[in-house]
Amino acid sequence: MTEHVQIKTAKWDSGEMEYFRFGRGKETLVIVPGLSVQSVMRSADAVAQAYKALTDDYTIYVFDRRKDLPAAYSVRDMAEDTASAFRALGLGQVNLFGASQGGMISMEIAVRCPELVKKLVLGSTSACVTEGQFALIEKWIQLAEDGDAAALYSAFGEALYPEALYNAARELLIELAKSVTDEELRRFVVMAKALKGFHITDELAKISCPVLVIGDEDDRVLGAEASREIADRMGGRPGVELYMYDGCGHAAYDTAPDYKERIARFLSGQAALE
């Protein structure tokens, strides 16, 4: 049985950020999650269980966004704060996995703080959020601003998960929505608005560490081409791999049964495409 995971706080001169840690391996794996209605800190035990197979080889850290979110907060701001949290904990040369918005944050860190990143895994993310992609996110923002947590959870889940899985989880999502606070909705709006105009495509060539890009053909949030574009912009250099699932949805990082194994193979130097 997975041991109960404790939530801790990383502190630096200008901010604080919650995180949790599990595993006992010599290597460090840091996970930066995507945009969510409620913090991943609420699901710490479930995350630890999901990554249990990696805990012998890795000590795993999962970071939230900073505690006191300002009204205007860009993805680059998020990356700067996350890097500050790394440094506050003495983390460097980490294996970094970012999913969705977390992938955008991770790309920013890899570009601006290359000394912090040993290997990079990017899941269901994009180097450039287009107006078409942001149109969906804008609908989520409106639901959050209206205070309609049930509709937000429903719309969010429908976009992230394959239809069958969403239909099976619909009642659970409605139940989860009952616990959403006004502050959680405010934070969601700030984080979602940060996606507008995000663009790091022209800087991807600066990333020199090994990179695994994982996408899904049925990604209804950012689209399958977003993952291909990232891999293409890396210049086809050695050390860059692209793997595309089909039918797992945007949240393939949760739904694909071999996702964690694929990450582990890449980090250990094996081909993730096998």
Predicted regions and their residues:
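Conserved HGGG/HGGXW glycine-rich cap/lid loop of the alpha/beta-hydrolase fold
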Residues: T9-L69
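Conserved acidic catalytic loop of the alpha/beta-hydrolase fold
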Residues: D77-V94
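Gly/Ala-rich beta-loop-alpha elbow adjacent to hydrolase catalytic centers
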Residues: G98-G102, S106
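Flexible "cap/lid" loop of the alpha/beta hydrolase fold
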Residues: V111, K118-G147
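Conserved alpha/beta-hydrolase catalytic His-Asp/Glu region
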Residues: E131-Q133, A151-F198, D202-E203
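Short beta-strand/loop motif that positions the catalytic acidic residue
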Residues: I207, V213-G215, D219
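Catalytic histidine neighborhood in serine/cysteine hydrolases
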Residues: E225-A251
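Catalytic histidine-centered segment of alpha/beta-hydrolase-like enzymes
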Residues: C248-K260
